[in-house]
Amino acid sequence: MRILLTNDDGIHAPGLQALEKIARALSDDVWICAPEYEQSGASRALTLADPIRVRKLDSRRFAVEGTPTDCVMMAVQHLIEGGRPDLVLSGVNRGQNIAEDVTLSGTVAGAIEGMAMGIPSIALSQSMNYFHDEIVAHWETAEAFAPGIIQRLLEVGWPADVVMNVNFPALPPESVKAVEVTRQGFRDGHMRHMDKRTDLRGRDYYWMGFTAKASQPAEGTDLRAVYEGRISVTPLHIDLTHNETVHTLKGVLGGAPPRKVGA
């Protein structure tokens, strides 16, 4: 089995090293194509206004000056020799990718691009506990459980237009409670904010900030599973259509387009 690895934390990220260990537990045919620089929050961005440059680190390891989506496209179309990959693994991300964050995630986007190119794809993320003074990433947890989960998923299979999103709780392996197949959750509070600061020349600038606060996630969601110490496996569908609203709107907007009132 030929496996392509990518991420959004960059070619030197410890999570990519963890992912390589995971992949090599499954196959000896592993290729790595990751961003030269961190691309967290890049989502499915493409590099359109600049040339994409590639640095070859060894025969099967490449750093790309671009996004995770660029990396997967570049690897499949130009860099991998002898055939397309059978599996794309994206991660292991430093921090969870659950709930509404999946639409921002470059890690999930790398898996989506693999799916778009007809390759079974899985995103993997390692949660961290931001409520503690010392934030620790338990890469050993992802390394311990990911190979078995991936193998089981490959045995069962999944639809061609679905990607698997796997999140490991912020716990050492011996404290993980179970694996749970979940749906995508939604937080009950907005966590992002813009932090305004002033430089030494009196000019304002801003940093994107995140508020670490507890949520009350619904049963069966990725949020609930990870918060309670379980591994979350969520099948994600690229079709974002809300079918209930489609049904409602058809009764209101079907037929001739409405004109402005009073026109």
Curated annotation (Swiss-Prot):
Entry keyword annotation includes Nucleotide-binding: yes
InterPro entries: SurE, SurE-like_Pase/nucleotidase, SurE-like_sf
Residues spanning the membrane: none
EC number: 3.1.3.5
Binding positions for a divalent metal cation per the UniProt entry: 8-9, 40, 93
Cofactor note: Binds 1 divalent metal cation per subunit.
Pfam family, one: SurE
UniProt similarity note: Belongs to the SurE nucleotidase family.
Protein name: 5'-nucleotidase SurE
